[in-house]
Design a protein with these regions (language model features):
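Short amphipathic beta-strand/extended segments with alternating polar/hydrophobic composition
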Residues: 1-2, 22-26, 39-48, 101, ...
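N-terminal mature ectodomain segment of secretory-pathway/periplasmic proteins
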Residues: 1-37, 67-73, 78, 91
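Acidic/charged, solvent-exposed loop-and-adjacent secondary-structure segments enriched in E/D, K/R, S/T
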Residues: 30-59
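A general structural signal for short secondary-structure boundary/capping elements
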Residues: 58, 74, 132-135
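A short, amphipathic edge element
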Residues: 60-74, 118-121
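Gly/Pro-enriched, hydrophobic low-complexity segments
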Residues: 80-173
Length: 177
């Protein structure tokens, strides 16, 4: 769930027997753990990371002012025989990341960012048009542990903006497994 105007979001997962979510309402970040415990997330680089995620969700690098981010060319890089235009993007009050764009299609191919002390490499593929926007249907996340996390988008739609209350920290719902 993403608010493309205000940058708020909720990322939820439901992989039985566990479910949880994280969110950012534009000012505060929170996490709902599988136990149902809900906590504010404000330590370390949590808020700058949330700001950077909101920046990416809204594709602000395509705006005339780049959404207020500092953008520096890191040249071209190749991977699998393809060439990518690489930018170092630092959103205002966010964390820097490398964004790799396919030099032919200009679609986002990869992001490289530091999440606290962990380097995350996310690869985007299988783009499809949704209401005129190209959306990656497959994301592969490499956190360096040797295990890859693959996310597959099964449906997407654009709708009217929800009130910011939709992105606020939810109530606790404590339970045992």
């Amino acid at each position: 769930l993403e608010d493309l105007q205000r940058g708020a979001f909720v990322d939820a997962y439901d992989i039985p027997p566990q479910a949880g979510s994280t969110g950012y309402d534009g000012a505060k970040a929170w996490e709902k753990e599988p136990s149902g415990t809900v906590t504010d997330q404000a330590g370390g680089d949590v808020i700058p990371l949330a700001i950077t995620e909101a920046y990416q969700d809204r594709n602000l690098w395509w705006q005339p002012d780049h959404g207020g981010a500092e953008i520096v060319s890191a040249g071209q890089k190749t991977d699998g025989g393809n060439t990518y235009d690489v930018l170092t993007v630092t959103p205002k009050d966010g964390k820097p990341l490398e964004a790799w764009f396919d030099s032919k299609s200009h679609l986002l191919y990869r992001t490289v960012e530091m999440n606290s002390v962990q380097k995350l490499i996310t690869t985007y593929s299988d783009y499809a048009a949704v209401d005129g926007a190209q959306i990656a249907k497959k994301l592969v996340i490499d956190d360096g542990s040797g295990n890859l996390q693959t996310l597959t988008l099964t449906s997407a739609k654009f709708s009217e903006a929800l009130p910011l209350t939709a992105y606020r920290k939810p109530a606790e719902d404590l339970h045992d497994f």
